Amino acid sequence: MKVRASVKKLCRNCKIIRRDGIVRVICSAEPRHKQRQG
């Protein structure tokens, strides 16, 4: 899980979602693409 000021999709399988006011990226194909804004 990377924590970044600006989260971006890194591949076409990445999805941007918002949970409890926190923007996250989840990726089914590449778990290393997981990110959280903060």
From Swiss-Prot:
GO CC annotations? cytoplasm; ribonucleoprotein complex; ribosome
Going by the UniProt record, its keywords in alphabetical order are: Ribonucleoprotein, Ribosomal protein
Domain of life of the organism in this record? Bacteria
Q: Show the InterPro entries listed in the entry.
A: Ribosomal_bL36, Ribosomal_bL36_sp
GO BP: translation
Offer an example of a GO molecular function term for this protein. structural constituent of ribosome
Per the record, the similarity remark reads: Belongs to the bacterial ribosomal protein bL36 family.
Q: What is this protein called?
A: Large ribosomal subunit protein bL36A
> From which organism does this entry originate?
Pseudomonas aeruginosa (strain ATCC 15692 / DSM 22644 / CIP 104116 / JCM 14847 / LMG 12228 / 1C / PRS 101 / PAO1)
The top of its lineage is: Bacteria, Pseudomonadati, Pseudomonadota, Gammaproteobacteria, Pseudomonadales
